[in-house]
């Protein structure tokens, strides 16, 4: 089962489904040879994670403190005190390596947004905050996102992650509206 799941996931990422009328010579894809990825076992931070963090560090959110809870629930998602966590996706870590072992072989799977060709998150966002470039990058506009997390709910991989204490809702109605902003890999678009 695990082998089939791994193969399916890679096939989905490398060869997104599209109709003949949707073909674009500008569409970008990522092909990763998992046989060559060793998880950068000799480094404290894998090279792909380090490169992503260096490229996007200026875009990471700086929440207003104290972070307000999501009304009417007394909770919120604040990763700002855990920015160095590279073991999962957060608003400060847009890619991580998942380690699995199949038949005694170690496999490292880069986990990040797959930039779905027909992205369900883009269709479902009630605020129209998600767009897709000609190159296929699925981008969340942090100036428009209210952090409703519908994109994460519909994402088959739960990729977008919310950071409270940032976003347009702070200007509109900080105690009643929204929950922050959703963040994810956008192909460095």
Q: Which positions does each model-derived feature cover?
A:
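Non-ligating segments of multi-cofactor redox enzymes
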Residues: 1-189
């Amino acid at each position: 089962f695990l082998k089939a799941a791994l193969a399916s996931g890679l096939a989905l990422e490398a060869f997104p489904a599209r109709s003949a009328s949707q073909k674009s010579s500008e569409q970008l894809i990522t092909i990763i040879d998992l046989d060559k990825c060793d998880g950068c076992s000799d480094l404290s931070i894998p090279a792909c994670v380090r490169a992503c963090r260096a490229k996007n560090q200026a875009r990471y959110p700086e929440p207003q403190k104290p972070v307000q809870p999501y009304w009417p629930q007394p909770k919120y998602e604040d990763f700002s005190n855990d920015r160095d966590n590279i073991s999962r996706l957060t608003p400060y870590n847009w890619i991580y390596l998942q380690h699995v072992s199949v038949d005694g072989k170690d496999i490292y799977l880069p986990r990040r947004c797959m930039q779905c060709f027909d992205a369900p998150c883009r269709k479902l966002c009630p605020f129209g905050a998600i767009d897709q470039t000609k190159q296929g990058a699925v981008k969340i506009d942090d100036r428009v996102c209210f952090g409703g997390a519908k994109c994460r709910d519909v994402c088959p991989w739960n990729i977008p992650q919310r950071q409270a204490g940032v976003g347009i809702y702070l200007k509109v109605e900080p105690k009643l509206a929204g929950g922050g902003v959703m963040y994810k890999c956008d192909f460095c678009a």
